[in-house]
Amino acid sequence: MTAHLIDGKAIAANLRQQIAQRVAERRQQGLRTPGLAVILVGTDPASQVYVSHKRKDCEEVGFISQAFDLPSDTTQQALTDLIDRLNDDPAVDGILLQLPLPAHLDASLLLERIRPDKDVDGFHPYNIGRLAQRIPLLRPCTPKGIMTLLESTGQDLYGMNAVIVGASNIVGRPMAMELLLAGCTVTVCHRFTKDLAGHVGRADLVVVAAGKPGLVKGEWVKEGAIVIDVGINRQEDGKLVGDVVYETALPRAGWITPVPGGVGPMTRACLLENTLYAAEELHK
């Protein structure tokens, strides 16, 4: 058996097409064009690439994109003032603060400064709290994108044993809440977990988001399981690999995401989806 590939690139392209169509319809109806403000502090190369992709995505779907490229020595107060200004700007539906920030800045305080109805990354405690209370509003982009990928398989998640490897605030923890909402029995593994192989081996669905290349061995995977690999790691030869050993997982899994081309494109597409939702439902 060889796993079915979950093509995140194609699914994300379809989602962007739907968003672009809705933006065009809004224009025809005389409604405001959705706006996204992207804040980048410093010159981190990976962050610069991510931000350029997000700006291109905005252009593709017809959003108005505002770019704020700030120097590395930008102060906490200057960033706070900028966020306050964007919070009050009716043309801005979403505010994205690109992480990581330089060490002298307090990311938690700045993320909390973003108005919850403009928090299109879904990181604000208010939005995480709503997800925990089973009344999600703006949902964290990567877990939201993963749920769309899972829906594309047509598999019924109710009652599945789901294992998440990695307990970050960005992926692991909100992913656990998403899968609970979907009716899964959820186990979250982390750096102190004993017998990781045993947990993975019992899972009908595995989501791996640890940032460690090859952490999950293919032979651990249960026959027919769904494998979602969030990891994206660059090797010395320049090749991008995930947190799962893809070659050995492929013949065992029922469904699997490739790296690259799996989860990453969906994270970006869901940022656009959240921005459109904010424009249509929260900023009427």
From Swiss-Prot:
Molecular function as annotated in GO: methenyltetrahydrofolate cyclohydrolase activity; methylenetetrahydrofolate dehydrogenase (NADP+) activity
Pathway: One-carbon metabolism; tetrahydrofolate interconversion
Positions of NADP(+) binding: G166, A167, S168, I232
Family annotation (Pfam families): THF_DHG_CYH, THF_DHG_CYH_C
The EC number(s) this enzyme carries: 1.5.1.5, 3.5.4.9
Keywords: Amino-acid biosynthesis, Histidine biosynthesis, Hydrolase, Methionine biosynthesis, Multifunctional enzyme, NADP, One-carbon metabolism, Oxidoreductase, Purine biosynthesis
Keyword Hydrolase found: yes
Entry's Gene Ontology BP terms: L-histidine biosynthetic process; methionine biosynthetic process; purine nucleotide biosynthetic process; tetrahydrofolate interconversion
Keyword Transport annotated: no
GO CC annotations, alphabetized: cytosol
Chemical reaction(s) catalysed: (6R)-5,10-methylene-5,6,7,8-tetrahydrofolate + NADP(+) = (6R)-5,10-methenyltetrahydrofolate + NADPH; (6R)-5,10-methenyltetrahydrofolate + H2O = (6R)-10-formyltetrahydrofolate + H(+)
Homology family: Belongs to the tetrahydrofolate dehydrogenase/cyclohydrolase family.
Subunit details: Homodimer.
Role, per record: Catalyzes the oxidation of 5,10-methylenetetrahydrofolate to 5,10-methenyltetrahydrofolate and then the hydrolysis of 5,10-methenyltetrahydrofolate to 10-formyltetrahydrofolate.
Xref: PANTHER family: C-1-TETRAHYDROFOLATE SYNTHASE, CYTOPLASMIC (PTHR48099:SF5), C-1-TETRAHYDROFOLATE SYNTHASE, CYTOPLASMIC-RELATED (PTHR48099)
Protein name stated in the entry: Bifunctional protein FolD
Organism, as annotated: Pseudomonas entomophila (strain L48)
